[in-house]
Amino acid sequence: MTNIRKSHPLMKIVNNAFIDLPAPSNISSWWNFGSLLGICLILQILTGLFLAMHYTSDTTTAFSSVTHICRDVNYGWIIRYMHANGASMFFICLYMHVGRGMYYGSYTFLETWNIGVILLFTVMATAFMGYVLPWGQMSFWGATVITNLLSAIPYIGTSLVEWIWGGFSVDKATLTRFFAFHFILPFIIAALAIVHLLFLHETGSNNPTGISSDMDKIPFHPYYTIKDILGALLLILALMLLVLFAPDLLGDPDNYTPANPLSTPPHIKPEWYFLFAYAILRLIPNKLGGVLALVLSILVLMLMPLLHTSKQRSMMFRPLSQCFFWILAADLLTLTWIGGQLVEHPYIIIGQLASIMYFLLILVLMPVASMIENNLLKW
């Protein structure tokens, strides 16, 4: 009798992707974040769906509909906070996943890497639009400030901003379209994630050593299914600790004040996961320059395969490159901290130095370090 798992057209796809998939025997916990991102996405779609059942995307009722969800809907508060903090967990997993790719040279899988960068942009766009929906002070002013950046584009900028707003300011039309986009984008993300996996399975997974693991493969199930379940349990534990004990820890108190176009908050800032990019944006005195730096801070990831000068793929056996990688990690934490501070001395100069350091590390120092390591090994 033929095994349905291997003969049924649909089950065959699942089998080849999650059950009989040959996987390297030595992949560490850093390889768990892909599955965790999948879990985060499913969680966000489900909680978001239930929130959308009670939310109204109208400027007059949006804020009160969110309050209504928290106060009157059965377990509405937990759904709302799981969705808000789920986004934070999503970005923690995303940054870890990208960092893993950089450290172990996974960017040499060109298609997988580039789709990953597109996914990162899409998730960032989705999160930004979601932050606007509760229509609090920070929602409104965050939307105003960030969309206004497009006016820096020469010639078409102003028209483009007004077209996105659907008027001459952030208003009802803006909120409605942001809700529509926020609803559809996660499904586009899911589709892109499938393509991401498709390209990954063309080559097979990388591993910590960066060398071919063709001679030593193990089946994905049960080894990595069990490992992924452990990762998922730890993720859910962390999320629920956040939701049940400190739901507003990562939020902004200003968002508990309804949006008021006549009163600007003293300090406009995005959610914590955008602070590093926001710091780079506002520390460049020129508007267009700031916008370009903001886009390049993420787009620079696409250059990673071109900047790979080492004869080895992974950083596992490259101490100098490791050193620069962890300096980059510390630099990103510094930028995140600066993004949350006021634009005043000494934060301005610290931020400018950290911004220069960010681009310098990726574009110059890490490729040079790789060349030095090649020479030291007489390659």
Curated annotation (Swiss-Prot):
GO terms for biological process: mitochondrial electron transport, ubiquinol to cytochrome c. Heme b b562 binds at residues 83, 182. Its cofactor is heme b. Keywords: Electron transport, Heme, Iron, Membrane, Metal-binding, Mitochondrion, Mitochondrion inner membrane, Respiratory chain, Transmembrane, Transmembrane helix, Transport, Ubiquinone. It is a multi-pass membrane protein. A ubiquinone binds at residue 201. One of its GO terms (cellular component) is respiratory chain complex III. The chain crosses the membrane at residues 33-53, 77-98, 113-133, 178-198, 226-246, 288-308, 320-340, 347-367. Heme 1 (or BL or b562) is low-potential and absorbs at about 562 nm, and heme 2 (or BH or b566) is high-potential and absorbs at about 566 nm. The cytochrome bc1 complex contains 11 subunits: 3 respiratory subunits (MT-CYB, CYC1 and UQCRFS1), 2 core proteins (UQCRC1 and UQCRC2) and 6 low-molecular weight proteins (UQCRH/QCR6, UQCRB/QCR7, UQCRQ/QCR8, UQCR10/QCR9, UQCR11/QCR10 and a cleavage product of UQCRFS1). This cytochrome bc1 complex then forms a dimer. Component of the ubiquinol-cytochrome c reductase complex (complex III or cytochrome b-c1 complex) that is part of the mitochondrial respiratory chain. The b-c1 complex mediates electron transfer from ubiquinol to cytochrome c. Contributes to the generation of a proton gradient across the mitochondrial membrane that is then used for ATP synthesis. Belongs to the cytochrome b family. PANTHER family: CYTOCHROME B. This is Cytochrome b. It comes from Taurotragus derbianus (Giant eland).
